[in-house]
Amino acid sequence: MTHLQFDNRLRAELPGDPEEGPRRREVLAAWSAVQPTPVAAPTLLAYSADVAQRLGLRAEDLASPRFAEVFGGNALYPGMQPWAVNYGGHQFGHWAGQLGDGRAISLGEAIGVDGGRYELQLKGAGPTPYSRGADGRAVLRSSIREFLCSEAMHYLGVPTTRALSLVGTGDAVVRDMFYDGHPRREPGAIVCRVAPSFIRFGNFELPAARGDVDLLRQWVDFTLARDFPDLPGSGEDRIASWLGQVCERTAVMVAHWMRVGFVHGVMNTDNMSILGLTIDYGPYGWVDDYDPDWTPNTTDAQGRRYRFGTQPQVAYWNLGRLAQALSPLFGDAAPLQAGLDQFRDTYLACDRRDTAAKLGLAECQDEDLHLIDDLRALMREAEMDMTLTFRGLVDLSPQQPDASVLREAFYDETKRAAQAPALGAWLQRYAARCLQDGASDAVRASRMRAANPRYVLRNYLAQQAIDQAEQGDLSGVHALLEVMQRPYDDQPRRESFAAKRPDWARDRAGCSMLSCSS
């Protein structure tokens, strides 16, 4: 028996749907009561020891068959009261109406050993009123990707939801991976993701779009009371301060994405966390050869709305939709604009901080922004790996700058040779700036190692682990989980996990481009 304690404030304090069960319907309330749909043979495949410890779960809890039953959707611990939340959102720039938790079911809000709140949410636990004709299930490949990325991002220092467990269901799920008329049966799985709150921008957009100001205000009052209890003031001033905090947190999150080369892939407003956490890991990816126009999402391949380089602008646009949703609570738009301005100010400050850290400098001067932009242009022209380039610069000697420290970063020898003179000139500029900074080589290297990861969850690494897991071998998943817990360290005998994308993975499904099929 676990010792988890729940208070489930969302269910207790926000209006619920009078109808229970998964029947698809328009819902005018904040949430709907719905039970997970049982599966054939729930089996624990992997778990996060850190998240389990925060929840107070013991080794015997995790080893118990009851744990797999609960987090596979077949049973409940005392105090759990499952629900799915109602929200809307803008998808690819267009209003999509009611969306909601189509295959996510929250089991409860647990109070951890640190006194913090940990909402436990099963993804792939069956249909809800918001499933929109889908089966509410998830396949093993997408579940592995969400489980691993949730944990990898945490250890990279990126604000994120976490993952407690990955449970195989024993059931097959039919999916058309690229929506091309070739569906296939795939093994099913369920991830338990964990966060203090899963409230999204879309929770406020939907009642605003419906003209339901009462429910909008209830959502705002609840969010302030539960998730932002220390905000001072009252009325419009407090709501404006809250929006400013959301804008700041979102800016910090996206700045971290840009620092480590992460591309979310589906930055719809229903995938934006009110806490500034990375949420909903679908067709995400890490930049391999540097390209600000790259997106991993096949659905976005033509318009490239959510490409790597535009993520800050998209985040700002999404915050504008949140501000618009809150506008019925304000007599004047000026406080809302002031909150939005905090995004730009915070993002620019984070960008300067990260520029200095990635280059190993004590502070970022204006010319350093040009220096790093010129490096990015070189990386693009020479087809250089982003992660390996910045990590390789750690070993550069400012006294004798030598491009050989970047030899592992190139994908194309012809392009390397063509850009060699320009790269050499840039290295001379960078070396001079390091000497001007005055820090020792050891201090500079320490700064850079803390900002430039050695290991990131490249798509091809995740796909290799998925291929093994689909054959019943979870060793690849466990190895990746272990390596990604120390992304900034040089790990002996783990060098293969730091290698750039191999040629075979350039165009392979799951390694370069992914769909939303999951």
Swiss-Prot record:
Residues reported to bind ATP: G100, G102, R103, K123, D135, G136, R193, R200, D280
Reactions catalysed according to its record: L-seryl-[protein] + ATP = 3-O-(5'-adenylyl)-L-seryl-[protein] + diphosphate; L-threonyl-[protein] + ATP = 3-O-(5'-adenylyl)-L-threonyl-[protein] + diphosphate; L-tyrosyl-[protein] + ATP = O-(5'-adenylyl)-L-tyrosyl-[protein] + diphosphate; L-histidyl-[protein] + UTP = N(tele)-(5'-uridylyl)-L-histidyl-[protein] + diphosphate
Class in the EC hierarchy, top level: transferase
Active site positions: D270
An example molecular function term from Gene Ontology annotations: AMPylase activity
Pfam family for this entry, one: SelO
Keyword set includes Manganese: yes
Enzyme Commission number(s) of this protein: 2.7.7.-, 2.7.7.108
Cofactor: Mg(2+); Mn(2+)
Classification via InterPro entries: SelO
The UniProt record lists the keyword Magnesium: yes
Domain of life: Bacteria
NCBIfam families the UniProt entry points to: PRK00029.1
Function in brief: Nucleotidyltransferase involved in the post-translational modification of proteins. It can catalyze the addition of adenosine monophosphate (AMP) or uridine monophosphate (UMP) to a protein, resulting in modifications known as AMPylation and UMPylation.
Protein name: Protein nucleotidyltransferase YdiU
